[in-house]
């Protein structure tokens, strides 16, 4: 694509169409942009547009498109073509910093993100001048430019907060500190001075305080891994100024907005974080500054209002106290009973109150409320911080703290009892306090795993939780009902089973509550209870115990999906999945009705997939319906196909990328249930599964391979007979997969199925080429994973076609190649093979080579006979060799910044491990003994003499054991 006006005009038109709300206009435009993004100059055209377009909407759209393009394509993935040409990469890096700094803020943010994505891959090795170019801009004096640099540096360095320690990381941070720490400190001091100079200029202060907040964030990132020497030497400068900013109160920066945090709050919040970091990690060095920070933060807490805009500040300030009170160093600051009472009264109790803003969120923004309350994204909430402070104080002062709080809990509950309708918030706070007091350790999987023994959880449940759950009107006091459900959920591991069983029917009833939070919590609580393990590793609650409630449970769960706002509620769908899994065959009578509801739901969500978790659990539930019903009666598979295929066809035709991996897995499950034949409906689809475009998406590969394996297993003969022209396409897929280090094992899965299930004559013309391709890959990049898969394939080929055929095909490629493969690959590497089925295949294959291949007994290959036998005995007896060569590159596809739909494995579409040898060989050691016996009777004297001259004593001893077990001997 040339950099010319015509192309800029075309790009402008298509970008405008991507903003169209009409999908018939928007989708073709998105497809067009996708089709041209591989062309050279495409990123430069976007950068030109965002710089020069007259239309601001197009500029912003170009910036967002550019950022997403970089996110998808910048990383160079091994084995895949470079998606951005080298000249484009160089040009982007040469221009982007300048462009970002001269752009308006809306565009600056997008380009700043793009720089950090590029930096994640290229900095520092491939972009060594990035930092010096950025630091040079500090001298510009223009705070629009300076803030652009700071914002970019923040997005570049914030990963230091969660990276694992490594030499590479240390050297990168050292480089950053050497270049950046001093200019940042100078900028910090200069900005503080400018704040004093412009103390009465509100516009200047807004810009300067934005800078200070970014500087404080950078301080946190650069100090997170370890205390750098530079910052230790300059601690006085940083801490004195941080303390000054913490105690600053500039009326000009106060906002009237009750919701949105202002610049002053954001800066103070970050300073609290920085102080907490130093108090936790560098307490010795920070000790001289700690008392004044404790005083400043305490004063801040007791003087800050209850408005939402202060939430982040208050929660960070409380988190600071929580991190301080947990350290033995600072224990003395909290020992006094009056101090504990004061903290409880002035900090903890006020911040546990359920405010009108919380009530609003509960009713009108339930999704966000649930996300915060259930999923632990409540890190920045006052309640969560107050809860953490209670836990921190209990570490050293459990007795006194429990006594103080028990008094508060009792008085709150008695206030509630006087007038429940008016005072229900008192009970809410009491439940929250009890929860914080009682929780010592918690996990997602088990809820509270360690509780404060001074709190009687069962008594509290019976007296204060059960009455709310039993109340006949599920829509009355929804917040207290949600609290009660949550109590059951988080203390499930602490409450006795009989109380959990008492709660189950009550929770089922609460699925009918109109409140989204309430019916979501009920679904989540049931799902968690159904996963609890009892004795013997079985589920704690059994299908038999659920029998009286099964119908109501299923009805209420599906009805709950009809509530406004819960049409794609992931908690309800997960509870449906878990109920199916627990109830097993008890659900069969209901499936004819439920499958219709599930497929209807699938059709709806496939129009615009937006809730990945919901969609995943929906497909899991479909798999369970199929597995459970067909286990009882395999012929019902056709009724599932009738229900599902119309929806699947629509998903395939509309190329709903997110759903294709799921559809392929469910189809595999259905096809695997058929007895040995392929229905015509599947054969019609077969050619489409070989289309290269499907195989370009990483997420499709594992499920597509499994689906093709199912085709081969059920209809290798049919494919050879009626679709022989598709065999080259099938082998083309194998060829593509084998060339990739990330997917070569999938190529072998496919190849092994082809060898196992296709009639031998249908492959005659292709066999030699298959081996040549494998050797080419061995020469170009030999990884441990590839060799293990190669060994399994070679031995499977031997089992299927015989040892002579294996030797002949190797030697037809190149004379004496069979010996080279044995000597260089099989003998030294076979011990790396892992997995019982894989080891069995190798053992049977090698046994055949040893005992059924004449060339091993009377040619130059004979010298390899004993080493090969020794290697086989090693495979049986030695521990698996899991060593990996030092220089081997690990393919990391987990954190690709621009990943395609990752493969989502459906747990309930699980495939049984297939053993191609099956019962034909029970014990490979016995097979070896019997085969050696047979060989020795055919050529008497040869085998014992080869063993006695060159097999080591330990291996010989093991072999004697096999012969005895098989009751045979060598002659």
Swiss-Prot record:
Entry function: Export receptor for importin alpha. Mediates importin-alpha re-export from the nucleus to the cytoplasm after import substrates have been released into the nucleoplasm. Negatively regulates fluid secretion and plays a role in fluid homeostasis by down-regulating cftr activity.
Keyword entries, A-Z: Cytoplasm, Nucleus, Protein transport, Transport
SMART domains with a match to the protein in the record: IBN_N (SM00913)
Keyword Transport: yes
Compartments, as annotated in UniProt: Cytoplasm; Nucleus
GO biological process: protein export from nucleus; protein import into nucleus
Occurrences of domain Importin N-terminal (ranges): 29-102
GO MF term set: nuclear export signal receptor activity; small GTPase binding
Subunit details: Interacts with cftr.
Domain of life: Eukaryota
GO cellular component, one term: cytosol
InterPro entries in the record: ARM-like (IPR011989), ARM-type_fold (IPR016024), Importin-beta_N (IPR001494), XPO2_C (IPR005043), XPO2_central (IPR013713)
Chief localization: cytoplasm
Name of the gene: cse1l
UniProt name for this protein: Exportin-2
Record's keyword annotation contains Protein transport: yes
Lineage: Eukaryota, Metazoa, Chordata, Craniata, Vertebrata
Protein family per UniProt: Belongs to the XPO2/CSE1 family.
Pfam families: CAS_CSE1, Cse1, IBN_N
Gene3D superfamilies: Leucine-rich Repeat Variant (1.25.10.10)
């Amino acid at each position: 694509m040339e950099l010319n006006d015509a192309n800029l005009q075309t790009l402008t038109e298509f970008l405008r169409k991507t903003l169209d709300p009409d999908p018939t206009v928007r989708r073709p435009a998105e497809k067009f942009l996708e089709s041209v993004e591989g062309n050279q100059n495409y990123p430069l055209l976007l950068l030109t547009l965002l710089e020069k377009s007259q239309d601001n909407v197009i500029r912003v759209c170009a910036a967002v498109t550019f950022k997403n393009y970089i996110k998808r394509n910048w990383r160079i993935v091994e084995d895949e073509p470079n998606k951005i040409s080298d000249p484009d990469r160089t040009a982007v890096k040469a221009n982007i910093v300048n462009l970002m700094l001269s752009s308006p803020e809306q565009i600056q943010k997008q380009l700043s993100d793009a720089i950090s994505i590029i930096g994640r891959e290229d900095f520092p090795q491939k972009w060594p001048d990035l930092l010096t170019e950025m630091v040079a801009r500090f001298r510009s004096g223009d705070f629009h430019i300076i803030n652009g640099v700071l914002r970019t540096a923040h997005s570049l360095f914030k990963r230091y907060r969660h990276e694992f320690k490594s030499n590479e990381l240390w050297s990168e941070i050292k480089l950053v500190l050497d270049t950046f720490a001093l200019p940042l400190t100078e900028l910090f001091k200069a900005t503080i001075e400018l704040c004093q100079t412009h103390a009465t200029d509100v516009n200047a202060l807004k810009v300067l305080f934005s800078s200070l907040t970014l500087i404080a964030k950078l301080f946190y990132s650069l100090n997170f891994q370890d205390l750098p020497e530079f910052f230790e030497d300059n601690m006085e400068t940083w801490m004195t100024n941080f303390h000054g900013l913490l105690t600053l109160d500039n009326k000009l920066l106060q906002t009237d907005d009750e919701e949105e945090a202002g610049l002053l709050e954001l800066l103070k919040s970050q300073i609290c974080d920085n102080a907490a970091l130093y108090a936790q990690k560098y307490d010795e060095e920070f000790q001289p500054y700690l008392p004044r920070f404790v005083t400043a933060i305490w004063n801040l807490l007791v003087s800050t209002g209850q408005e939402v805009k202060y939430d982040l500040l208050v929660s960070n300030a409380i988190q600071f106290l929580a991190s301080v009170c947990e350290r033995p160093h600072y224990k003395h600051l909290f020992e006094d009973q009056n101090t504990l009472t004061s903290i409880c009264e002035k900090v903890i109790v006020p911040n546990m109150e359920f405010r009108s803003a919380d009530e609003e969120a509960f009713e009108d923004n339930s999704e966000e409320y649930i996300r915060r309350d259930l999923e632990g994204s409540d890190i920045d909430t006052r309640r969560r911080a107050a809860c953490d402070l209670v836990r921190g104080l209990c570490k050293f002062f459990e007795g006194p703290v429990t006594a103080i709080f028990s008094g508060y809990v009792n008085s709150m509950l008695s206030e509630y009892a006087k007038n429940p309708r008016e005072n229900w918030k008192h009970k809410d706070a009491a439940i929250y306090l009890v929860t914080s007091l009682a929780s010592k350790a918690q996990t997602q999987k088990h809820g509270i795993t360690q509780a404060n023994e001074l709190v009687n959880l069962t008594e509290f449940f019976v007296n204060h939780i059960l009455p709310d759950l039993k109340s006949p009107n599920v829509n009355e006091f929804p917040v207290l009902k949600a609290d009660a459900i949550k109590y059951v959920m988080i203390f499930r591991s602490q409450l006795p089973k009989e109380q959990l069983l008492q709660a189950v029917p009550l929770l089922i009833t609460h699925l009918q509550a109109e409140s989204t939070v309430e019916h979501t919590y009920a679904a989540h609580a049931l799902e968690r209870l159904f996963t609890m393990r009892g004795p013997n590793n079985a589920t704690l609650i059994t299908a038999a115990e659920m029998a009286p409630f099964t119908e109501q449970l299923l009805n209420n769960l599906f009805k709950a999906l009809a509530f406004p706002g819960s049409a794609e509620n992931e908690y309800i769908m997960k509870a449906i999945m878990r109920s199916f899994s627990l109830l097993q065959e008890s659900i069969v009578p209901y499936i004819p009705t439920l499958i219709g509801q599930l497929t209807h739901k699938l059709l709806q969500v496939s129009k615009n997939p937006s809730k990945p978790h919901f969609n995943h659990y929906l497909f899991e539930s479909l798999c369970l319906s199929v597995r459970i019903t067909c286990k009882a009666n395999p012929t019902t598979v056709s009724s599932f196909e009738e229900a599902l295929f119309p929806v699947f066809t629509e998903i395939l035709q509309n190329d709903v990328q997110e759903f294709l991996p799921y559809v392929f897995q469910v189809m595999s499950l259905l096809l695997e249930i058929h007895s040995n034949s392929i229905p015509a409906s599947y054969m019609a689809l077969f050619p489409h599964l070989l289309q290269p475009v499907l195989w370009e998406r990483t997420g499709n590969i594992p499920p597509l391979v499994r689906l093709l394996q199912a085709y081969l297993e059920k209809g290798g003969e049919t494919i050879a007979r009626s679709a022989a022209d598709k065999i080259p396409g099938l082998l083309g897929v194998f060829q593509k997969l084998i060339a990739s280090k990330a997917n070569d094992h999938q190529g072998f899965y496919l190849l092994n199925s082809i060898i196992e299930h296709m009639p031998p004559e249908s492959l005659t013309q292709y066999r030699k080429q298959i081996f040549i391709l494998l050797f080419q890959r061995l020469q170009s990049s030999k990884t441990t994973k590839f060799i293990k898969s190669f060994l399994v394939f070679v031995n499977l080929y031997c089992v299927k076609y015989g040892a002579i055929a294996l030797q002949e095909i190797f030697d037809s490629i190149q004379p004496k190649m069979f010996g080279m493969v044995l000597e260089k690959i099989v003998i030294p590497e076979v011990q790396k093979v892992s997995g019982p089925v894989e080891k069995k295949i190798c053992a049977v294959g090698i046994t055949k080579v040893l005992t059924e291949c004449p060339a091993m007994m009377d040619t130059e290959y004979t010298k390899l006979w004993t080493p090969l036998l020794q290697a086989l005995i090693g495979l049986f007896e030695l521990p698996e060799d899991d060593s990996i060569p030092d220089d081997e590159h690990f393919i990391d596809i987990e954190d690709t910044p621009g990943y395609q739909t990752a493969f989502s494995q459906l747990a309930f579409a699980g495939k049984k491990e297939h053993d191609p040898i099956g019962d034909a060989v029970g014990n490979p050691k016995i097979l070896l003994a019997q085969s050696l016996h047979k060989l020795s009777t055919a050529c008497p004297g040869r085998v014992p003499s080869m063993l006695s001259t060159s097999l080591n004593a330990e291996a010989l001893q093991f072999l004697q054991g096999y012969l005895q077990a098989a009751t045979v001997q060598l002659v």
